């Protein structure tokens, strides 16, 4: 630390006391005051934090605002951590100063369709259950709703915990503030005395695992080693009992997932993303080396017991395309199988926490590189991928992305308060709710009705292609039992299964991706037409083989 920073320490401490006064008023118990600590004492050990804190916008915020280190200071030494400080993970730690952002985050968008299945006749993917047969998502796959509910909705979804966790009552399903302040203020556990994964309700599954939860929360950030590897200092890992892990988690989408709490600078914390961008050298924009070079990510590794333990990724500049990609991305969050021999890939394998960081047309090769597939279809036996919300990769190369548009421009616009202050909305909602700040901000020649019309044009067209893809996939699936009964050879069936993989991939990407093609309409059209072609090819192959078998009798 240079002398200039040391001389500025008193000024930073005094300014930080102002925030501390506000913090004590908002969060302390009656009669309790937050007593600032000497940050220089903390920096004696936490040298990496010093580098970030002293030069960032949070330089005036004292350590005690987020940490209770009373016992830690008394028991720590240069060789031993001592009693670990208590670190605040709740979003209200930031709300003291960033009130407007917090209030917008907890605001529920009541215009959305809560818990609407994607697999209903009028929804996005009417034949989803048939096409995904054999996978846990067939038990429930709903449209997304407000981010405030992202953790609690994971706990209650029918495919995850067998119905163990439920809302305390139906009124709680609207309680965005409660869901943000603590999941267990709105949820109940059917059997708090047990931790085994089992079915409490019929027509449910127990498919959850610890990696799933890394998108929903980072409450466990200090207890999780890099990539979820087992480590003697880690309380949780990829192989932990997921029910016990779930009970230890409370808050959705912690502020520090995107904002470094010490510097206030932009960052990411999802280890799978850091691994893809930095460790594997794919960069922030794999299809645009120039942009990837401009938007760099620096991996910062923290040690525990003098061993590398966890890591964060500091961004050169704020880029919501990268920050949102911590969750809005296709990645492995489950066990699976090897393409080469069908052997099981367990949660102890790093492939169970893997970001492919590839678009729909590069995914197959990326999966082959790590020798992985997710599940076998219950009817055809084909080895298939199971795709998760690949918004980031879909956006790459689109007209909007090439013109410098980022996620926040459309989903988190700048909003002016009554006092004239401008802040970034953290409501993360559809541009339909704020066309003036989103679409019309660039398309000034349009009216709001024209912009909505263009959106509907793209999404309606894409949805039509999704439905056609499903029709031909279903037709192909229905032919497999017929072909088997007719005595069609395994060689022909395997050829059809390979076509099934392609048809499934190029279809399901667009049921998992949440824009119904709007993020990249040209890519959606090409992909879905490819799916239809592959299904038709398989249908023709199977029909010809069936006819040949019948004729030979």
From Swiss-Prot:
Reported pH dependence: Optimum pH is 7-10 for nitrite reduction, and the optimum pH is 7 for sulfite reduction with only 20% residual activity at pH 7.8.
Pathway the protein acts in: Nitrogen metabolism; nitrate reduction (assimilation)
UniProt-listed Enzyme Commission number(s): 1.7.2.2
Organism: Thioalkalivibrio nitratireducens (strain DSM 14787 / UNIQEM 213 / ALEN2)
GO cellular component terms listed in the entry, alphabetical order: outer membrane-bounded periplasmic space
Binding site for heme 7: 400, 439, 442-443
Protein name: Cytochrome c-552
Role noted for this protein: Catalyzes the reduction of nitrite to ammonia, consuming six electrons in the process. Has very low activity toward hydroxylamine. Has even lower activity toward sulfite. Sulfite reductase activity is maximal at neutral pH.
Regulation: Inhibited by azide and cyanide. Subject to competitive inhibition by sulfite.
Annotated heme 4 binding sites: 255, 258-259, 426
Post-translational modification: The thioether cross-link between Tyr-331 and Cys-333 may play a structural role in the active site cavity. Besides, it may lower the pKa of the Tyr hydroxyl group. An additional covalent bond between Tyr-331 and Gln-388 has been observed in some protein crystals, but this may be an artifact that is due to the formation of tyrosyl radicals when the protein is exposed to oxygen.
Residues that hold heme 1 according to the record: 42, 45-46, 72
Cofactor info, note text: Binds 1 Ca(2+) ion per monomer. Binds 8 heme groups covalently per monomer.
Positions annotated to bind heme 2: 63, 66-67, 262
Stored PROSITE patterns: MULTIHEME_CYTC
Primary site of residence: periplasm
Positions contributing to heme 3 binding: 58, 94, 97-98
Subcellular location, record wording: Periplasm
Binding site for Ca(2+): 330-331, 386, 388
Molecular-function GO term, any one: calcium ion binding
Chain positions recorded as heme 8 binding sites: 407, 410-411, 519
UniProt similarity note: Belongs to the cytochrome c-552 family.
Cross-link (3'-(S-cysteinyl)-tyrosine (Tyr-Cys)): 331-333
Signal peptide bounds: 1-28
Summary of temperature dependence: Optimum temperature is 80 degrees Celsius.
